[in-house]
């Protein structure tokens, strides 16, 4: 599935400096918040967030929380300690792939290289660690799915990144795609991947002070090879309280993301409360209209 790509570009120090300055200048452009094409239905968003949170529970809890009207199949551990489950509702002809993240943030950094790794099927550069995990999840999930059922995908953190690549594979295999929503998802590809898959129905949720969705950050080797990692899909930035900002594209990076990147090896997800799935779930719940119509 994954094949090697042979070359890595080198340049003189002067050329490197000019490329670096130009790239940083382009990365500094700020996207402007806008109105979403249609009002966000946070009751629906909550269905995705709850499933992404369930994925961290024990298998018995996942089965219980999912209810008796659906069939749930849970994977064993996959790459980097991740796990996934598939939920199929025969009556509604809807199926879900839910991918759990990992407790370690260092995997985002240690498997970052994409300049030598291209997925031969999708035809785009991908983050090696996320791609490896996605392939394992897809191998587990595909035999459990029906191509004519609406297929929804969700995940948090590393799991969200793998879920996006799974969504790409579903498209290539002709599945009927529903909505994909991710929470705190890092970047998975570059400009080539963005061009090819930007039309996918992907909505990314980002807590306002969560640095993880800005990873991997701008890296000189990426600018000189396939270009920097980029996001695609609309982005919803969740503030504290019932407030959010909608962007049709990824806004500029957090200024602190580079020092955060350098310190990843010393951090766990618990050290970054804005990145916790529990925090995402709480922010989504704050935006769900109450029964009183508030």
Regions found by a protein language model. Give the residues of each.
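C-terminal motif of bacterial Sec signal peptides marking the signal peptidase cleavage site
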Residues: 23-26
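Hydrophobic helical h-region of N-terminal Sec-dependent signal peptides
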Residues: 14-20
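Bacterial N-terminal signal peptides that target proteins for export
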Residues: 2-14
């Amino acid at each position: 599935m994954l094949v090697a790509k042979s070359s890595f570009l080198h340049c003189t120090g002067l050329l490197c400096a000019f490329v670096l300055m130009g790239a940083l200048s382009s990365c500094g452009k700020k996207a402007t918040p806008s109105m979403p094409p249609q009002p966000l239905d946070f009751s629906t968003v909550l269905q995705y967030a709850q499933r992404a949170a369930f994925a961290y529970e024990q298998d018995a809890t996942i089965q219980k929380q999912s209810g008796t009207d659906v069939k749930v199949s849970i994977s064993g551990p996959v790459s980097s300690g991740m796990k996934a489950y598939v939920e199929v509702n025969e009556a509604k002809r809807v199926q879900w792939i839910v991918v759990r993240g990992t407790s370690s943030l260092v995997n985002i950094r240690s498997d970052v290289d994409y300049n030598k790794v291209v997925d031969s099927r999708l035809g785009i550069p991908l983050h090696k660690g996320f791609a490896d995990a996605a392939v394992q999840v897809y191998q587990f999930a595909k035999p459990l799915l029906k191509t004519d059922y609406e297929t929804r995908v969700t995940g948090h953190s590393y799991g969200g990144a793998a879920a996006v690549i799974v969504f790409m594979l579903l498209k290539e295999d002709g599945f009927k795609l529903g909505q994909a929503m991710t929470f705190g998802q890092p970047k998975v590809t570059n400009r080539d991947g963005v061009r090819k898959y930007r039309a996918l129905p992907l909505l990314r949720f980002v807590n306002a002070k969560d640095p993880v969705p800005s990873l991997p950050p701008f890296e000189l080797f990426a600018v000189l090879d396939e270009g920097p990692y980029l996001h695609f899909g609309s982005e919803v930035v969740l503030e504290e309280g019932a407030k959010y900002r909608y962007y049709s594209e990824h806004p500029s990076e957090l200024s602190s993301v580079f020092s955060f990147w350098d310190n990843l090896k010393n951090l766990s997800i618990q050290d970054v409360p804005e990145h916790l799935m529990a925090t995402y779930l709480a922010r989504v719940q704050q935006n769900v209209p109450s029964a009183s119509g508030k």
